Design a protein with these regions (language model features):
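Blade-level signature of beta-propeller repeat domains, shared across WD40, Kelch, NHL, RCC1
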Residues: 364-399
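Conserved blade-ending motifs and adjacent loop-strand segments that build the rim/top face
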Residues: 279-293, 341-369
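Blade-loop segments of beta-propeller domains
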Residues: 81-84, 90-138
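Secretory targeting and sorting signals
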Residues: 2-37
Length: 399
């Protein structure tokens, strides 16, 4: 399952989500027998719905540096909310400290796929350490015109106010999965998935802002020559040598490599080369690959200017297309800027579910320690009919 299948149910309010899910399972998802109740290891981040987890370790927030903030999408009645959790003990425990309440996600209008970001430097009037939260809203409106809306917090996630809108759809198609980075020019960049172009089922787009308010330069970063291809779910990290690394999935016609994970690199975080280039498929030495909902992290590594990349995908496959034994229990590491083979390490949170949909191990959040030797993961899994987030931290084994 992909975040980019045109007919898939997005992260809707619970009153409509589960009936839709049940109706579409046969056509959209690959499901095998097996219990999914409380399948994930780790500790519950919250005892209730918590979708699309994201986590940041504060590094530009003065006395709050070292705290970990985590966000998930949740619901109260028909209102979509961003729940903000905080850890002051290195990820050993979390408590809820704030809520993002977007009126455009209230009353059943729809909320999906949020992100959380700490500004590493001043952007306009916003000092370094300002927190940003962004999400897709409006997918359930009768006259759908989705938007990517940004909120900010200047009090370590306790309160939030609307800042700007990255993009608003020109038609009833989708805008999904915003993620942030700061490019080499010092501007804030938003990366997102765009379904509004009639020439592409979906493509990846970037826009940027010098002040956090006015977004300009909207342009394609990955757009296949095949109209049916659906590149999406981009996440960008800047490596230690200044190179920018983008992970994403490409969903297309059914087959062994449907929704397989790819990557591209950029020298400045804004220009990504020929837009029709679909990038490189990362693999392990024995040919394993990830499919669906990738997520990415970077950390320094002693003696290595590039640092260390961490990559996770929803499902892990063997070279021959069979599901790998370590699927749902594996994270990858690479110390060569993505080049060459990737090394497998145990995932801190093990998700044993055999269901492939928008919950189990879907876009799991990875957060390395400051020295890169430990890794916090927040992953979701079904607990009965509720998609819940679980967290745990593990050591990163030496190569």
């Amino acid at each position: 399952m992909s975040a980019h299948d045109p007919a898939r149910p997005r992260l809707l309010r619970p009153t409509v989500l589960f009936p839709l899910l049940l109706a579409l399972l046969g056509a959209l998802f690959v499901t095998q027998s097996g219990s999914s109740a409380d399948a994930a290891t780790g500790t519950l981040l919250r005892d209730g719905t918590g979708l699309y987890p994201r986590a940041v370790r504060l590094a530009h927030s003065g006395d709050a540096n070292g705290r970990i903030l985590a966000s998930v999408v949740t619901f109260s009645g028909n209102d979509g909310l961003g729940a903000i959790h905080e850890s002051t003990d290195g990820g050993a425990s979390f408590r809820e400290v704030g809520t993002v309440r977007d009126p455009d996600a209230a009353g059943g209008q729809g909320l999906c796929c949020s992100t959380l970001y700490e500004l590493p430097q001043r952007i306009g009037d916003m000092p370094a350490g300002t927190l940003l939260w962004a999400a897709s809203v409006g997918q359930d409106e009768p006259n759908r015109r989705m938007a990517l809306r940004v909120f900010k917090s200047t009090d370590v996630g306790r309160s939030w106010s609307h800042l700007s809108t990255i993009a608003t759809a020109s038609n009833d198609k989708g805008l999904w999965e915003p993620e942030f980075s700061v490019d080499a020019s010092g501007q804030l960049v938003a990366h997102y998935s765009d379904e509004t172009d009639a020439a592409h089922s979906q493509k990846l787009v970037a826009a940027r802002t010098a002040d956090g308010v006015t977004w300009t330069g909207h342009h394609d970063t990955v757009a296949s020559t095949l109209a049916s291809d659906r590149p999406g779910m981009a996440v960008v990290r800047k490596m230690g040598d200044g190179t920018y690394f983008m992970s994403f999935e490409i969903c297309a016609a059914a087959g062994q490599f449907q929704c397989v994970v790819h990557y591209r690199t950029s020298s400045d975080g804004w220009n990504w080369g020929v837009t029709t280039s679909l990038g490189i498929r990362p693999e392990t030495a024995d040919g394993k690959y990830f499919k669906h909902a990738p997520n990415l992290a970077w950390a320094p590594e002693a003696g290595n200017p590039k640092g260390r990349l961490f990559l996770v995908g929803q499902v892990l496959y063997n070279r021959d297309g069979s599901k790998a034994a370590g699927s749902g229990r594996t994270v990858w590491v690479n110390s060569a800027g993505g080049a060459g083979s990737w090394r497998e390490i145990p995932a801190p949170v093990a998700v044993e579910s055999t269901t492939v949909d928008y919950c189990p191990n879907y876009s799991s959040s990875l957060l390395p320690s400051a020295d890169g030797n430990r890794l916090l993961e927040i992953a979701t899994d079904w607990s009965g009919s509720v998609c819940k987030p679980y967290f745990a931290t593990g050591s990163v084994p030496a190569a």
